[in-house]
Amino acid sequence: MILQDEVLMTTLYLNEQQSIVKKRDGYLIVQYPDKRTVEVPLVKVSQVVVSGDVTLTTPALHTLLGMGIEVCFLSMYGQFRGRLSPPVAKNVFLRREQYRVHADQQCALKVAQACVRGKLENMRTMLLRANRSLQDPEVADATVTMQHMIRQVSCASTVGSLLGIEGNGSAAYFGVFGKLVRGSMVFTHRRRRPPTDPINAMLSLGYTLLLHQVSAAIQVVGLDPYVGFLHQPRYGRPALALDVMEEFRPIIADSVVLNIVNHRILTEQDFQEELGVVHLKPEARKTFYAKFEERLQEELQHPYFDYRTSYRRCIELQVRLLGKWLTGEIPHYLPLSVR
């Protein structure tokens, strides 16, 4: 399956097993096992996501890297396997400031607080929106708890205490997330490794795709994705990407999942269990990718710049704002908080 917009540069999702992707002139040529072929103009591709047994030829990979296009590799079931990235951007001075702030605990704490505040505010907004029609007292109580957690963010004196606040706020949110779900699917709690029900399976896949979007934006701006402020560096862990991703989790990934479930776009029959782990079936993954891409292209009124732009563009704007704060061009890093 290929998903891409006819006009905008978007993510190219390669999901058809045993496909081969070649490069010819200004196109990627996707050859399917049944001999069908599809031509994709390279000028319309900003990123590539490969799921499972899909082969990209060396010329295709060289062309993508030469154009600065990242390739993300997932397993057939959507687990992250790795990323092929172009050379790091040449702005060494920006990364030097990133490393300096990372080493300064108080400066790093300011960024970490902004990331947590943005996440909790957007989680709370999701609950407030849903409860306009639900009128559920438990959801209302959760919004009060989360407002209390948001107020505590600025009082946190260490990243450790901040993570505790984030954990309490997330627990309140996911404690009532199941009440936002309509229909026969059930959500009781967040289960990451492994996902054992359809909603957790979709949340995990959504977060994986979101992490790739954020990592690609960080690559474009020229920051180091492995040096963060909230998430501490660990071997192979894209800490900065996880930091920036926090404020987008509820308004992109969670929103996609609720849309799919509540409009019965996917049902329990679109999932399969293997060794206690629940996965989306191949056709269901195609649908999920399409809905995720739709959300990235959806526009909103940007709260700081006062113009309409897409969620995909908002991700890059947030990374650029972080870069400007690191270099002292703006006084604060403000997370993207929606209303």
Can you describe what each PLM-predicted range is?
Residues 2-24, 33, 39, 90-339:
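Active-site helix-to-loop segments that bind/position phosphate- or nucleotide-bearing substrates
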Residues 44-47, 52-125:
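A surface-exposed, charged beta-strand/loop segment in the N-terminal or early-internal portion
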Residues 22-54:
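N-terminal ordered "arm"
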